[in-house]
Every structure is written in structure tokens, then in C-alpha cells.
Amino acid sequence: MLCLGIESSCDETGLALVRDGKLVAEKLASQVDVHAVFGGVVPEIASREHLRVLPVLLRELLKEQRLTIDDIDVVSVARGPGLQGCLLMGLSFAKGLVLSCGAKLVGVNHLWAHLTAAGLEQDLQFPSLGLLVSGGHTHIYLIESPLQFTLLGRTLDDAAGEAFDKTAKSLNLPYPGGKLVDDLGRQGVVNKKLFPVPYINNDNLDFSFSGLKTAVANYVNQNSNLRLDTMGIPEEGVEEPAISEERKNMLASFNYTVGRTLEVKVERALKRNRGVKSLIVAGGVAANSVVRSVMTDVAAKFSIPLVLPSMHLCTDNGAMIAYAGYLMASAGCRHDLDLDAIPRGRVIPSDWICEG
């Protein structure tokens, strides 16, 4: 079975081919440079970029593999959550391909795909506990199969990735700033009391990072010397050493606070779900070194394996959509051409059609 995956939920255009569960090839076009001047993603521009790039990537992908669209058995596409216009670009493109070549159409939950992406590199054991940490979502799932996810905890306001983005922006770090927050923080010294660990004094598994965002903003406002004068990293020797170290220490403390928050909630979830066979951590923030280190320790504490996708599978990509589509199609699931795009904030229904 050859499955084409299409990812267009935000500002990455990704296409990939998975054959019988193995990644054959992939293409990814990033829009980082396009949106950097605005300091964030502009939905209209992102949609137009998807429209422009999708056919180009498909031609390149098929040509390099010496394939045609008639060789494709399944077209899987991210149906949500995401930016409505961006999702519609991918969905319309997928439907056009299905009409052209007669392949099956499978709509993929973008969030679930992040968590099952590690299956491209190793066998997944179920049931598993899944932690999804991204720009828009911080969720904990009980995963009983690739098609059965139970949401145990979710972000109530701002996700962890949003806190990273706003922290970077408050310091005038270049967009996207998540990696710089990690890299600079690794050079600093942690002050565990600098920022409050948010929303842990309760008995639930939900997250709230709005308070941490506010605490960071207040700290930067009180210490305006932390901000770079312009959006960018200054040349070597421009900064005063003390200011540079203070910034690194602040970011080290911020990284610690996010990691500690995730640690508390995941440990609580594992105590309530003792039967899980592994801990899966995915999403863009899963590339953060502190998050990876903390989750390694948590998994060891509960004597279960930690499943972390490779760095390139943590961020949005076509491979995770292709693999999730392959899993669904292998289980006999598909969608009709009336498949809808589901933007962020709405529940994605399990409305697939099962055959056999």
C-alpha cells in the first residue's frame, strides 16, 4: 500500500510517501522566511504559499521516485486542527488527486499524527500515555490504538509553545524563537524560584501557561536591558557580558519552569494509568532539550520506555500524516469527498467509514 501524506495545517507544506508502513520519501517547504518579517504567521499569506507550493512538491516527489499519481493507493491529508484557510488548501488538493487517480481519501487528525509519528522509527506499544506539546496544544492522551485516543488533560488557555513564542518575542529574538530560547537557556543558570510553576496545585491533568507568559512579560518589563534593540542576535562583542548572562539565566529558568509543569502533570497521569506500556512525547516543543531530559527521567521513574520521535518528526511534516493515513487505511478506514476541514478550537469527529 502506497500512501501519500499532505500537511498544510499552518506554515509548513509537507508531502511524503509511506509504503507498507515505511517512509519512502518526503518533501518539506518551510514558510519561516516569509513570515519572519511579521513576527508570526499571517494566515492569508500561508494559505497562498500552500496553494503555490503543493503541486511543485508533488511533481518533485513523484519524479524522484519514478512514480505517477496512478501508483498512489491512499491520499491522507491533515484535516485539523489548524488554520482554516491552510487546511482547505491541503484538503482541496487531496480531493483533486483522489478524483484524478481513484485513490482512497483519509482525513487525519493532525494532533494524533504527531503522536503516532514515532512508529516510523520504532514499534509502538499500546496502551501508551501520550504528551503532545506544540505551539497551539498541550494535551495528555491515553492511546489504546492508533485509532483510539482518550483526552485526559488539555491546555485551558495558552499552550507551552505559545509561551515559548511570546518569551522569545518579549526579548526581540528572531522568529521563530523556540530553538533560541532552548539554546541560550542551556548556557544559563537556573533559578527555580524566578517564575511560578503554573497550574499544578490541583488534582487535574489540564495545563495553563497564561500565568507564566504574564510573569515573563512582567520580568522583562522590569528588566528592559534584557531586550535586544532590534529583532536579531547582535554581533559578537556588542552586548555587555553581564546583560548577556542575565538573559541566558532568565531563559534557563523559563525552560525549567515549563519542564517542571509538564513533569508534574505527566507523573500524575502515569500514577492514574498504571497499565500503560510506554510514554510518547511529540510536537514541536518535544524538540526542547529540557523537555526531553525531564521526560526521560519521568519514564525511567515509572520503568517504562520513552518514545521520542526524531527532531525532524517533532515539527509539522508530511511523513507523520502519511503514516497516520497508512494506519487508518490498513484498519479499513476512509472518508468520502465531503470531508471537512476542522479549524483549531473545534472537536475533530471520528467520522471515518470502516470497511471490513
Swiss-Prot record:
Q: Which Gene3D superfamilies match?
A: 3.30.420.40
Keywords, in A-Z order: Acyltransferase, Cytoplasm, Iron, Metal-binding, Transferase, tRNA processing
Give the protein's cofactors: Fe(2+)
Q: From the UniProt record, which GO molecular function terms apply? A: iron ion binding; N(6)-L-threonylcarbamoyladenine synthase activity
Superkingdom of source = Bacteria
What are the BP-aspect GO terms? tRNA threonylcarbamoyladenosine modification
Signal peptide segment: none
Note describing how the cofactor binds = Binds 1 Fe(2+) ion per subunit.
Task: Give TM regions.
Answer: none
**Record InterPro entries:** ATPase_NBD, Gcp-like_dom, KAE1/TsaD, TsaD
Catalysed reaction per UniProt? Answer: L-threonylcarbamoyladenylate + adenosine(37) in tRNA = N(6)-L-threonylcarbamoyladenosine(37) in tRNA + AMP + H(+)
Listed NCBIfam families: gcp_kae1, T6A_TsaD_YgjD
Q: What does this protein do?
A: Required for the formation of a threonylcarbamoyl group on adenosine at position 37 (t(6)A37) in tRNAs that read codons beginning with adenine. Is involved in the transfer of the threonylcarbamoyl moiety of threonylcarbamoyl-AMP (TC-AMP) to the N6 group of A37, together with TsaE and TsaB. TsaD likely plays a direct catalytic role in this reaction.
- Protein's UniProt name: tRNA N6-adenosine threonylcarbamoyltransferase
Tell me the gene name: tsaD
